[in-house]
C-alpha cells in the first residue's frame, strides 16, 4: 500500500511540474543542471528523496543548481566546514531546496524557495551521536551570473555571484534539459507521512546517516595538517 501511495504521489508531482511559472528576462543559456568540478553533487533523485525524507551523501563536497525554462530552480549542496581549533571536528552539511527564480532587469538572479520544502542534514561528530535533520529554506540573491565556454574543459561554465559579489565555486553544464525532482511544492503532500519527524525544531535522524557522514571527520584526521576545508 505504501508503495502504491509513493507511485501515485510521484506521478502527481511529476505531472504538475508542467504547470509552469512565468519568468521575465528569460535566458535560455541558464537552463539545465550545473555542477561543481567534482560532479559528485547533482540535483535530482540521486541527492534527495522527498517521499522517504532521505539524503544520499555524495562521495565529495560540491554544489549543483538546476534551472527550467519556465521559472523553477533546484539546488543541492554538500558542504564541509572545518574547526580551526579542533581539526578533528569538521561539520558536514547536506542542503536541498527548490522553488522559483526570477531575473531582474539589472541581471540579478533571485531564488525563492517553496517554504517548508527544503531540508538540511547537519553532522558534527564531536558534539553529538546523531545527525540533525531540519526544514530549510533560504532566499538567495545573486548579484549577477555569468555563462561562458571554458576553453580548458571545453564545457559551458556558470559562475554565480552572491548578493555581496562573492563568487561561488564555478559550475559546469551537466544536463540539458535539467535533471530535477518534480517542481511542485511537496510540503502539503509530506505533512502526513512526516508529521512525527517535525514535532520539534531539531530532530535526531536515524543512526544510518551518521555512519555515512563521519568518514569526513576520519578522513581529515588522517590528513592531519589541514587547517580548514570549506566548500561554499
Curated annotation (Swiss-Prot):
Please state the gene responsible for encoding this protein.
rot1
| Protein name listed in UniProt | Protein rot1
Q: Which GO terms describe its biological process?
A: 'de novo' protein folding; protein folding in endoplasmic reticulum
Per the record, the similarity remark reads: Belongs to the ROT1 family.
Describe the function of this protein: Required for normal levels of the cell wall 1,6-beta-glucan. Involved in a protein folding machinery chaperoning proteins acting in various physiological processes including cell wall synthesis and lysis of autophagic bodies.
Residues that carry a glycan: 83, 104, 129
Q: Could you tell me one molecular function GO term of this UniProt entry? A: unfolded protein binding
Q: Name a GO CC annotation attached to this entry.
A: endoplasmic reticulum membrane
Where would one find the signal peptide in this protein? 1-21
Q: Keyword set for this entry?
A: Endoplasmic reticulum, Glycoprotein, Membrane, Signal, Transmembrane, Transmembrane helix
Q: Which Pfam families match?
A: Rot1
Primary location class: endoplasmic reticulum
Q: Which residues lie on this side of the membrane: Lumenal?
A: 22-211
List the lineage, top down.
Answer: Eukaryota, Fungi, Dikarya, Ascomycota, Taphrinomycotina
Q: Where in the cell is it found?
A: Endoplasmic reticulum membrane
Superkingdom of this entry's organism?
Answer: Eukaryota
Q: What InterPro entries is this protein classified in?
A: Rot1
Membrane topology type: Single-pass type I membrane protein
Q: Which residues pair up as cystines?
A: none
Q: Which residues cross the membrane?
A: 212-232
